[in-house]
Amino acid sequence: MDIALLIKAAIMGVVEGLTEFLPISSTGHLILAGALLGFDDDKAKVFDIAIQTGAIFAVILVYWQKIRDTLVALPTEKQAQQFALNVLVAFVPAVVLGLLFGKAIQAHLFTPVVVASTFVIGGFIILWAEKRQERNPAVARIHEVEAMTVMDALKVGLVQCLAMIPGTSRSGATIIGGMLLGLSRKAATDFSFYLAIPTLIGAGVYSLYKERALLSVADVPLFMVGLVFSFVSAWLCIRWLLRYISSHSFIPFAWYRIAFGVVVLATAWSGVVTWTP
């Protein structure tokens, strides 16, 4: 297989791994990177599933102890049952709205103005959420995911649906949404990552079914390179972020989003990127 193509696959894997779990929208960055690398044909649609799989493996590895303990305790312990129920309840809204409106959103909302607007608006919402907790730390009433109720989980799940709008960021919506709903920065981030597991698996399986005609055994090496680089970069990114939020806010990501929104418009107006799915 062409070495240049494998290098592009590695770069795309790193982009996915570094952006999937940060509040900056992996979709927007993958579109831009794919356009700049010339890696945005039909094959890229299936490739996205491979690199997303790498990110899923990474978050499972980071949280494996909690996941394993929950599965073992699920038949007998109420806390484990409550946690599993919360993740399931938060997952359902995205499934329902995705099946109902996913095609319409892809057809009508993947435009430069929408993508740029959501980047910028999301940036200002992050600034607001962080300033709100800074002024009044008491608004963070939930400091551990185990303390969440089903209603808390449902609200986070509803907020996650906003990530269907391109440029929003799934992790950004759930983390910042969780903070605005009363979760601490750490609790919101942890729950966002737990929720990512069924959400990304569900989206991947659905996409794999839709794009099954594009699958080819010849592309396996390409997909494996992307998966491995995505896995490693996502694992490093998650571990770094969990350390970072223990003493820092998400404000730098807010300014990054605002700046990136300007980049989206500039690349679209210049014709460098078409910003279509």
Swiss-Prot record:
Protein origin, superkingdom: Bacteria
GO CC annotations? plasma membrane
Q: What class of enzyme is it?
A: hydrolase
Family annotation (PANTHER family) = UNDECAPRENYL-DIPHOSPHATASE
Q: Which InterPro entries match?
A: UppP
Keywords recorded for this protein, A-Z = Antibiotic resistance, Cell inner membrane, Cell membrane, Cell shape, Cell wall biogenesis/degradation, Hydrolase, Membrane, Peptidoglycan synthesis, Transmembrane, Transmembrane helix
The alphabetized list of GO BP terms reads:
cell wall organization; peptidoglycan biosynthetic process; regulation of cell shape; response to antibiotic
Extra notes?
Bacitracin is thought to be involved in the inhibition of peptidoglycan synthesis by sequestering undecaprenyl diphosphate, thereby reducing the pool of lipid carrier available.
Q: Which GO terms describe its molecular function?
A: undecaprenyl-diphosphatase activity
Q: What is its EC number?
A: 3.6.1.27
Give the family from UniProt: Belongs to the UppP family.
Q: State the coiled-coil residue ranges.
A: none
HAMAP family assigned? Undec_diphosphatase
Q: What is this protein called?
A: Undecaprenyl-diphosphatase
Report TM segments: 3-23, 44-64, 82-102, 109-129, 188-208, 218-238, 249-269
Membrane topology term reads: Multi-pass membrane protein
Q: Which reaction does it catalyse?
A: di-trans,octa-cis-undecaprenyl diphosphate + H2O = di-trans,octa-cis-undecaprenyl phosphate + phosphate + H(+)
User: Main role?
Assistant: Catalyzes the dephosphorylation of undecaprenyl diphosphate (UPP). Confers resistance to bacitracin.
**Localized where?**
Cell inner membrane
